[in-house]
A protein has these predicted regions:
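Secretory targeting and sorting signals
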Residues: 1-24
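Blade-loop segments of beta-propeller domains
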Residues: 62-97, 111-117
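Conserved beta-strand position repeated once per blade in WD40 beta-propeller domains
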Residues: 42-47, 76-78, 126, 179-181, ...
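Conserved blade-ending motifs and adjacent loop-strand segments that build the rim/top face
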Residues: 219-251
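Structural motif
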Residues: 55, 63-67, 94-102, 143-153, ...
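Beta-strand-rich domains and repeat architectures in extracellular enzymes and scaffolds
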Residues: 32-61, 70-78
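Surface loop/turn motifs at the tips and blade-to-blade linkers of beta-strand repeat domains
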Residues: 33-40, 68-72, 114-121, 170-175, ...
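Loop/turn-rich, solvent-exposed surfaces of beta-rich toroidal or solenoidal domains
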Residues: 174-225
């Protein structure tokens, strides 16, 4: 996952001759947007429901826990939430492990580490909590034909000192590229944002993907059928390369939120969290 460098905030100029306008992902229509701050709202978001109240928690460079940063955990991905639990995925530059910072419904926190399998990429792009809050789906960077499934830390695994083990995988029927975030829509369906810059896999860059599962995730592999809903909204006063980030599906009203970072200096001024609903 491409990181937000602080140097990007000091870029002096960028071409704004042909500002792209928002497009609609097929089947999903933009209904509004909010400015996404690049320091603390640039990696993703999760809707956390507790005691009948829903709050939106964002991640970015500025939300990295300082205590974890000094230990080398220098990147945070798209968070996930379910049943009052909130999970932040962390990665570091070595291949030692991945870390999941879990906040329980009572506000207590614990850190769980997952030792990499021999074949596993070190990237920790996102965390998606299954509807029953028993499993955690997570993803790697690059071109992949799988998503990974772990026991839900804090629920199915309650010892932070023990390794959070690999449980199973979602075997995709076609490859995906640079998936930045996923969230469950139902027990057998996820929506995912792809930052694919090439467009060769689904006929467009930056697609919104749907993954339909053969069965709910668990300790056995399941298959996932991937379809594209087209390109996510790209709109900025600047032209250049956008970066799609994490997603959240709000079950209350069926709103999908996705963070899209603008090119160049517009990263600061008009990056957005888009709100989409089924058209």
């Amino acid at each position: 996952m491409r990181r937000i460098a602080l140097a990007a905030l000091a870029v002096l100029a960028v071409s704004a001759l042909s500002a792209p306008t928002a497009t609609a992902a097929e089947g999903w229509q933009p209904v509004g947007s909010d400015r996404a701050r690049p320091l603390d709202e640039s990696q993703g978001l999760a809707s956390v429901e507790r005691d009948g109240q829903t709050t939106f928690r964002y991640t970015g460079v500025g939300t990295i826990d300082p205590a974890l940063a000094v230990q080398g955990w220098n990147h945070i991905g798209d968070p996930g939430a379910g049943d009052g639990y909130y999970v932040e995925p962390y990665q570091r530059d070595d291949r030692g492990a991945k870390l999941y910072r879990v906040e329980a419904p009572d506000g207590s926190r614990a850190n769980y580490t997952h030792e990499l399998e021999s074949w596993e990429a070190p990237n920790n792009s996102f965390a998606a909590v299954s509807p029953d809050a028993r499993w955690l789906v997570t993803g790697e960077w690059g071109t992949m034909d799988r998503l990974l499934v772990l026991p839900m830390p804090g629920v199915a695994m309650t010892d932070p000192d023990a390794n959070l083990p690999y449980a199973s995988s979602i075997q995709l029927d076609r490859p995906v590229r640079d998936v930045q975030g996923c969230d469950f829509v139902s027990a057998t369906s996820l929506l995912c944002s792809s930052d694919d810059p090439e467009g060769s896999l689904f006929g467009t860059t930056k697609p919104l993907l749907q993954v339909d599962l053969s069965a709910p995730v668990g300790d056995e592999d399941v298959t996932g059928t991937v379809t594209s809903h087209g390109q996510l909204p790209l709109e900025s006063a600047c032209s250049g390369e956008f970066e799609t980030e994490g997603v959240d599906y709000d079950e209350r009203d069926g709103t999908l939120r996705v963070v899209v970072l603008s090119p160049g200096v517009c990263l600061v001024s008009d990056s957005k969290t888009w709100r989409l609903q089924r058209g």
